[in-house]
Design a protein with these regions (language model features):
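Enzymes that bind and transform nitrogen-containing heteroaromatic metabolites
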Residues: 1-101
């Protein structure tokens, strides 16, 4: 098992993703909303594979950006729809290309 540490007090995502790419991995699946938000805020994510459910869920469901600085109406990245897939008649997968200002 190979273990590579990056950063002093926290992982250095740019270095970690560079190393992953050098090992031949071109795609990384990130399911942690706060880390996904971090990658977007650093302009390190080029695609967004986002799950949309047509079922309303209340409470603290919106966790993307919850622990980081939120994007405002003038500084958020735009997206272009790449594909739409459905799991059932009430659960869809939307894939977007992220476009930074």
């Amino acid at each position: 098992i190979l273990v590579i540490a990056t950063g002093d007090k926290a992982p250095d995502s740019k270095v970690a993703l560079y190393i992953i790419k050098k090992f031949g991995l071109d795609k990384v699946l990130v399911e942690t909303p706060s880390y996904m938000h971090y990658l977007v805020s650093q302009k390190m994510m080029d695609e967004l594979f986002f799950n949309y459910s047509c079922i309303y869920v209340g409470g603290q469901a919106l966790t993307i950006g919850k622990y980081g600085q939120e994007f405002g109406s003038k500084d958020h990245p735009h997206t272009r729809m790449l594909s739409i897939h459905s799991h059932s008649d009430h659960f869809f997968y939307f894939r977007h290309k992220l476009i930074y200002g």
